[in-house]
């Protein structure tokens, strides 16, 4: 587990698998912590702490987000909230982040410039966005469970499972190239764009390329088909997690909500870029049941 998941996820994403590398990296970090605990014959409590340190360091390193890594471990892995637990986890997060900065530079995963500051009259839209993200996260989790059950029934037919999953994934990517791999480049287009011509670049290399009038339909289809691409990837034998798909769907869902809000003039104007970012935090919160992780992760990713 110290290396197999990293290699498998790299191959999966490299060949277009619509998943993220974060979950395998967390598994690797946890496995390293567990192995260290066994090597030095630590007691069970210390070994669990080392597992948490490995998981948090993995999140902090891959996202360059030390606070999010710390909060993720506290919220998701439910490590004891005491100084004896917090200090080792914080040290591992900061060390992993510094290591990544040294070897990978200080660039952010997502490029975002705040051009429309927060205004109080956008509060109703933000509340409704939260409700929308909650519904989308519920759809994501339920659909994932159904698809996993379907592919589980094909476990006795590995070649049929591989062929069927590959057929679903390749068909979806053919129509919606944004589903290829992690999809972070597509999210960056939505975050950096300021008009339909710039946002329309998300449809490049697709059958809808150059048809900006179909942007809203493209965004909607991608939002609700990403879960099938992710399920087909993992169900057919790929290795990846739902962290990146949650960020991807959240960005597209937030943009879709804001775009529809502005098109139909439901209320005051809301900036699509801001709501795409808030949608990412909303989906992470809904899927992982970790609100603080969503807040700090998005703050540190941009």
Model region roles, listed by residue range:
Residues 1-302:
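Alpha-helical transmembrane segments and immediately membrane-proximal extracytoplasmic
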